[in-house]
C-alpha cells in the first residue's frame, strides 16, 4: 500500500478478499501500522467480510485510519436457512456490528439472498423483515438478490444431482452476472415460484429504500 501511495499517488484501497480480517489482533496491528508510518488514504471492504472478530474497538480503529465502507453478508434473515447453507454467522452479531459501524459514520451495505432451493415463504419473510430492520438501523444500501448456484458450491452439486441444473454454457454464466436485474427470475427454489420470488424481492427493496 505504501508503495502504491508513494509511486502512483493511490488515495483509496479496496480489499476484495472476503476473509481479509479473521483475527482481532491482526486488525488492530494493521491499523496501528497505518498510523505509525503514517499513511493517508481511505480504504474499503466492499465485497463482504467476516464479523466475528469485529467489535467497537476494532471498528473505531478502522474508521480512524480511513475505513469508509463496510459490506456485510448475512445472506439470510432466517436461522433455519443460515443453518441449511452452513453460514456460520449469528444475526445478533451482524446487528451489533452495524450499530458500532454507524457510530463511526461508516457507509454500511448488507447483502441478502432469497430463493435458496429449500427455502420456504416463512424464511423469505424473515429475510425481508431483517432487510427492513437494517433500514431502521441506518444501513445505507442493501443487496437483495435471488439465489444463483455457483459451480463448485455444495448447492450447485445438489442441484445437478436433482436434475435442476442440466447444461452449463455461456448463457448460464451470463445469468450469474445480472444479480441486480429486478426482472430476473430464479428457477431453483422448490417451494416458491420464480414470479413470486421476484415479487418478494421487489417488496423487500421498496421497503428498505422507502423507509
What do the predicted segments below correspond to?
Residues 119:
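Catalytic palm subdomain of template-directed nucleic-acid polymerases
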Residues 122-211:
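C-terminal accessory regions of radical SAM enzymes
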Residues 1-109, 114-116, 141:
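Conserved SAM/AdoMet-binding glycine-rich loop
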